[in-house]
Amino acid sequence: MVDARTDELRQAHDALAELYADRLAHILDRMPIDRAVLGLFCDLVLDGGLGTAVGDIGCGPGRLAPYLAGRGLQPRGVDLSPEMIRVARRDHPGVPFDVADVRSLPFEDSSLGGVVCWYSLMYLAPSDRPRAFRELARVLRPAGYLATAFKAGDNRLRRGGRTVGVEFDIYWLSPEEMRRQATDAGFHVVYWAGRPADPDEHQPQGYLIAQRR
């Protein structure tokens, strides 16, 4: 049975699928720091001999797929929202996408060289974070890499989506919290960074790359 919080998040992102596809389609072109962190992740996976299979967890409309594929990886996206997956399949027909929850991923144990969670872990309730990080570790090969971006803040619960007509829970996460969750799940943090908010953003952004032990 899906809990009310998860159902609200799914419905909200179903409603936002086309808007996100339009707004985010080429946003990486305007985000050099995000590209740099993703590029570092790609280099670590490929240089580590971990293969090319990577998961894009909370992929939304699939905006990262062209970049990851262009760097020589083979992404597979998953998202909680069926509408996000429908749009991702339409816009990126050469990439596999599936409906799935980060707390229960459709990947075999130790099957991926890397996983990307780009602004997707911030939707998890605090009680769900340990399970999600353990699940990410489960699907990674030994020495595989996790890369995540998140809205950096004080870990307090906020309500998001109101400016676009929906509502859902969201957390602005502290770097300390993200490092702790990764470490507790069996990761070794190899990189973390942050940047100030851009003019069209309301909060700083954080980045973390961690390697499965």
Task: Tell what function each PLM region has.
Residues 197-213:
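Core SAM-dependent methyltransferase catalytic element
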Residues 170-185:
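Short alpha-helix
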Residues 151-169:
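Short, glycine-/aromatic-enriched active-site segment of Class I SAM-dependent methyltransferases
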